[in-house]
Amino acid sequence: MGSTSTPASSTNRLQDKVAIITGGAGGIGETTAKLFVRYGAKVVIADISDDHGQKVCNNIGSPDVISFVHCDVTKDEDVRNLVDTTIAKHGKLDIMFGNVGVLSTTPYSILEAGNEDFKRVMDINVYGAFLVAKHAARVMIPAKKGSIVFTASISSFTAGEGVSHVYTATKHAVLGLTTSLCTELGQHGIRVNCVSPYVVASPLLTDVFGVDSSRVEELAHQAANLKGILLRAEDVADAVAYLAGDESKYVSGLNLVIDGGYTRTNPAFPTALKHGLA
């Protein structure tokens, strides 16, 4: 329903930048890796899925341009190794895209939500974001520059029935972490931002809910405020590229919402008005 054409003048916007993308073996992470390489960056993707991660690298470019490192973001030693391996290979780190995130697999109701599932989602979504920021800062502070971008969600500042309590809590936490890190790391020339997309038909959603991407897109479009266009992973990748690169050199602490105005509207109001006037 929409296009994601790239202006010719911006094709080198990340030239000579070095980026790490966690959760890079699929979905938004994979799409962002493709875009970063197209824009001239050297990319290291990290994931727990070795086969998928290596396949993504092979499909995108040569090993000197894009490479894979196994990384569980909940393990300090894995994240440390990820950053150290990137520095050893490329000599620096300009961009950290903390993109790993998972959904709850237990019922929405607080009475039925699983305790261990809550801990698992919190560990990956929040502690994982903390660790990637910590180890990125470890090498960015001496360099006095860098850009850290997180994938949050419209659930970072809203809530809705059917969206698990733990997922909403973790995305609120990622937004809080973004704001807090912006305050400290700005003193070292490091920018920290996040993106909050509306529904994207990624494997994260389709796998958990057991539906295909076309069904996810159909439901998302029905509920969307902005009609006639679907939000794609490419649109989120474009936003991440903006925050990662020099075009946003004085932008920090921003939660870039990519939702077509969804969170600015009250969908119950026009429905109630329509029924009231009928």
Curated annotation (Swiss-Prot):
Keywords: NAD, Oxidoreductase. It is an enzyme of class 1 (oxidoreductase). InterPro entries: ABA2-like, NAD(P)-bd_dom_sf, Sc_DH/Rdtase_CS, SDR_fam. The active site is at Y167 (proton donor/acceptor). It catalyses: (-)-secoisolariciresinol + 2 NAD(+) = (-)-matairesinol + 2 NADH + 2 H(+). Combinatorially expression of Sinopodophyllum hexandrum (mayapple) genes of the podophyllotoxin pathway (e.g. DIR, PLR, SDH, CYP719A23, OMT3, CYP71CU1, OMT1, 2-ODD, CYP71BE54 and CYP82D61) in Nicotiana benthamiana (tobacco) results in the production of the chemotherapeutic compound etoposide. The keyword NAD applies. GO terms for biological process: lignan biosynthetic process; phenylpropanoid biosynthetic process; response to jasmonic acid; response to UV; response to wounding. One of its GO terms (molecular function) is secoisolariciresinol dehydrogenase activity. Induction: Transiently induced after wounding and by jasmonic acid (MeJA). After an exposition to UV-light, first transiently induced before fading out. Pathway: Aromatic compound metabolism; phenylpropanoid biosynthesis. Its EC number is 1.1.1.331. Mostly expressed in stems and rhizomes, and, to a lower extent, in leaves. Homotetramer. NCBIfam families: PRK07231.1. Belongs to the short-chain dehydrogenases/reductases (SDR) family. Oxidoreductase involved in lignan biosynthesis. Also involved in the biosynthesis of etoposide, a chemotherapeutic compound of the topoisomerase inhibitor family. Catalyzes the stereospecific conversion of (-)-secoisolariciresinol to (-)-matairesinol via a lactol intermediate. This is Secoisolariciresinol dehydrogenase. It comes from Sinopodophyllum hexandrum.
